[in-house]
A protein has these predicted regions:
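Terminal substrate-recognition subdomain of acyl/acetyltransferases
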Residues: 1, 6-8, 44-45, 114-165
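A conserved beta-strand-loop-helix scaffold within acyl/acetyltransferase catalytic domains
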Residues: 8-84
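Short Gly/charged-rich anion-binding patches and loops
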Residues: 18, 99, 118
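Residue-level recognition of the GNAT/N-acetyltransferase active site
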Residues: 84-86, 116
Length: 165
């Protein structure tokens, strides 16, 4: 298994189609709306990440460089979004998360993700830590969003006014 990471400003249309093929499993929207969302919401510095087994795409996610105030210190994060597997329940998401954690460890990156309550246990299995909601302060309210971090010690407070990814 290996990661293929493509900066958004270098992605080819055929690679967008690969991403959409995996995303459609979790988010059943049409090809046009999926491509439109990616083009409209991703920035040049964002990255598309594919977990590959040989030539086969197993899973997909996005990484977005963002910042937040972590315990009073301006901190750079790699924001994890759109984690999805080509074959849900077969371990692709797990292997992708393990691989991205290894990548974060090797680069000394801090990870940040936002998720639904139902996904907290999944991410927790792979050393992502939930920040209690009362310790997270968004510039605009976001109900039902849970915040998790990777490669961060105990967080007393996160102030976040960057974009959602």
């Amino acid at each position: 298994m290996e990661l293929e990471i493509i900066k958004h400003n270098y992605i080819l249309f055929r690679d967008l189609l690969r991403a959409v093929a995996i995303k459609t499993v979790a988010w059943p929207h049409g090809l046009g709306s999926q491509v439109e969302w990616i083009v409209g919401n991703m920035r040049d510095e964002d990255e598309h990440v594919f977990l590959k087994d040989g030539n086969k795409d197993m899973a997909y996610m996005t990484l977005s460089p963002v910042t937040g105030l972590l315990d009073g210190v301006q901190t750079s994060f790699s924001g994890v979004g759109c984690v999805c597997s080509a074959n849900p329940g077969m371990g692709g998401g797990k292997l992708l998360l393990i691989s991205i954690n290894q990548y974060f460890d090797s680069e000394n990156y801090k990870g940040l993700l936002f998720c639904k309550k139902s996904l907290i246990n999944f991410y927790s299995k792979y050393n992502w830590k939930l920040i209690p909601p009362e310790r997270v302060h968004f510039s605009t309210p976001h109900e039902g969003v849970f915040t998790m971090v990777y490669n961060c010690e105990d967080v007393e407070r996160l102030e976040y006014d960057d974009r959602f990814f």
